[in-house]
Amino acid sequence: MAHDQLYRYLFENYAVRGELVTVNETYQRILTNHDYPSAVQTLLGEMLVATSLLTATLKFSGDITVQLQGDGPLKLAVINGNHQQQMRGVARLQGDIAPGSSLKEMVGNGYLVITITPTEGERYQGVVGLEGETVAECLESYFQQSEQLPTRLFIRTGQHEGKQAAAGMLLQVLPAQDADRDDFDHLAQLTTTVKGEELFSLPATEVLYRLYHQEEVTVYEPQDVEFRCHCSRDRCADALMTLSDQEVNEMIEQDGEIDMHCDYCGTHYLFNSLDIRAIRHDSSGNLLH
């Protein structure tokens, strides 16, 4: 794939659907401006792939946030994606994390939170204990508990052409369909054989042919995946206006300006005393652009 894309596909003879995604560029963008330990980089790649695959299961406009938190040296890791496959993510650390650290070693006593937020309607949140060895295993447990749909995730991270790479696949029994468990296990066994380098470098149709050449598979038009941060100067201004005038003035007096930094994309938004005065006198925010 020339750039990050997600493919949906359907097995003609089984009540099972699949997804295949490559997120190399998006993954590299999330890691830019962050000096994460290698184990955290790998974990964020796994979470990014998983979030993209989960977001593609949405039947409505909205977004999904996959978040890990606990009492270990990795305090927080979060990936957010929407139905347009616009992704962003960040991690927060407190302590050293050795190369090759396991999920449990990084997060400690913690949990995985999946938050689904429709554009219209009520937000849903599911919490899963870190029973599995990997993010994929934890999410498979989530699907089993909440959706009762047999689901498998196959996530690969590594390097391709000297850069970080991440990709993966999802298999899921179709809702309201009576899929034979043996059929699902058969397809899962085939999918398990996929190699990271195949996903990182080969066209999706070739990967699917290699895996399922004896099956009838319908592949749908791909959807682009990209890094997209939703921060803006206006949002930062709104946040500043939640503070008291005294707090804002003290920050200006101390440093001469207020520097608001976005953890997701690394953008800095600077506000001086003139900016603050303009914000206070223009509730519409027109002077901020």
From Swiss-Prot:
Positions of disulphide bridges: 229-231, 262-265
Gene3D superfamilies: helix hairpin bin (1.10.287.480), Hsp33 domain (3.55.30.10), HSP33 redox switch-like (3.90.1280.10)
GO molecular function terms attached to this record: protein folding chaperone; unfolded protein binding
Subcellular location(s) of the protein: Cytoplasm
One cellular-component annotation, GO: cytoplasm
Functional note: Redox regulated molecular chaperone. Protects both thermally unfolding and oxidatively damaged proteins from irreversible aggregation. Plays an important role in the bacterial defense system toward oxidative stress.
Record protein name field: 33 kDa chaperonin
Gene that specifies this protein: hslO
